[in-house]
Every structure is written in structure tokens, then in C-alpha cells.
Amino acid sequence: MARSIKKGPFIDEHLAKKVLAEGPNSKKIIKTWSRRSTITPDFIGLSFAVHNGRKFVPVYVTENMVGHKLGEFSPTRTFHGHAADRKSKAKR
């Protein structure tokens, strides 16, 4: 279920203050643990370091990202590939 339009997008207060302090197209990277914050048009052109549980992943915000959450661009799980099929290799 999506968030009500009446409520508006959720942005952590401490993150909103950092974004307003930086200004548009700032080169400084904003470090955050707030994966749940929605990306608004104010974020365009800014760089964030979003924590994925182990390290900070750099995220540069573009127009296409508006409306999504910061956490969507910082994957938390590492995919190492599926196990090889040993039966098909043994027949060759």
C-alpha cells in the first residue's frame, strides 16, 4: 500500500536539514543511515553515502530517482550466483 498523498513524502528531519544546508549541485557527500527517506526534487544533483548494513554505498541522485527511497539504490544482499549443475558437466 502506497503512502497517502495527503501526508506527503517521508524524509527524516536530520537528513532534510543537511540537504537544505548543502544547496543544489554540491560536491560534498552526505552520509546517512536513513534508507527510508523518500527522494524529493531538492535532492537532485546531490551525492549521498547510504548505509547498507555493512558499508556506505555512494548514490548520485538524478531526476529519474524522485519518488523512490534512498535504500532502493543501496543493495543489502550480495548475490554470488547459483550453484553449478554437476550432473550435466559429468556427462560430457
Curated annotation (Swiss-Prot):
It holds the Pfam family Ribosomal_S19. GO terms for cellular component: cytoplasm; small ribosomal subunit. It comes from the Bacteria. One of its GO terms (biological process) is translation. Keywords: Ribonucleoprotein, Ribosomal protein, RNA-binding, rRNA-binding. GO terms for molecular function: rRNA binding; structural constituent of ribosome. InterPro entries: Ribosomal_uS19, Ribosomal_uS19_bac-type, Ribosomal_uS19_CS, Ribosomal_uS19_SF. HAMAP family: Ribosomal_uS19. PANTHER family: RIBOSOMAL PROTEIN S19P FAMILY MEMBER, SMALL RIBOSOMAL SUBUNIT PROTEIN US19M. Belongs to the universal ribosomal protein uS19 family. Protein S19 forms a complex with S13 that binds strongly to the 16S ribosomal RNA. This is Small ribosomal subunit protein uS19. It comes from Pelobacter propionicus (strain DSM 2379 / NBRC 103807 / OttBd1).
